């Protein structure tokens, strides 16, 4: 097995100052993309259920399937970016596909149409995500990677705040389909920023080998990475999508026209915790922060059933769920580079996202089914039990594995 130092080596072309400028530029790309995406997602669950007539189980299947498609493409694009030594071409392609897809929600006449559009959007996300994360990790030293992902996530989430607020404002003058069409504008700006301001970081090309050769090279003898993927997969088997939080908010009495503001509350909380969680991860350990993220999710699961009778509770639930998303999404990405050499990071991020995608698909379908058939309490009980298992496993990982990689 490679030594810890070998697995965390950096491309010689990156520097902290220039690298953080690249991270900031990528953050701006994500800002405008999330502006576009969250305009759509703030109203999409109700469009699918109320306008198109889907059930909660179908909503879970749509979201889970779309994410599965996305995560599968991340494996392919991540591996290809390692083989070619190029990240940016995949990032540009992915953002362009997503931007072009979302306006077609306006033409959806059934939940099948909505699923196809959602899948197209997620294909774009799948193409770009692993190479983009590898580009972020390649841009800075390993000691600053938590800050880099925290900064990127925070700028990203500022767009996720603006998007639902913009959707709320637009709903005062146009219908939901008009919101879908308007999402094209910020998405196009994102692609332009990416093309003109994000720089490629030169990395060592991986020697030519069959497609799955990268996976073999990545995982051979790398027990820590395999264990980390297993633990993350277990947690993802219990995690549920934000869409269920919005449906629960409606049950708590939030009017449909106000739901985008509940979604904005998720994203405000998500944004506020991004940079602090990245800095804390660099200081106390990324694996410890991951446990904290899992614990916050467990708390949000309990809040799904412990609050009722007051619409204001929905905003508290949204805020706690946003904290979980901010910590988890920042730290789960930041922990990978410690165990992987730079020329295999695209593959590593792709494999990570594939594991998460498959497990998240199962979780969302099962959560929606349990809620429809047995009630919300059964669905939350399932999520909570799985979360406790993942937390326990991560604590063992911290005690047994992390000390071998401590710097």
Please give the residue ranges for each predicted region.
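C-terminal ends and interior cores of transmembrane alpha-helices
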Residues: 96-109, 295-309
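Helix-loop junctions at membrane interfaces in 12-TM secondary transporters
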Residues: 106-118, 306-317
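Helix-loop boundary and gating motifs at the non-cytosolic
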Residues: 13-68, 224-262
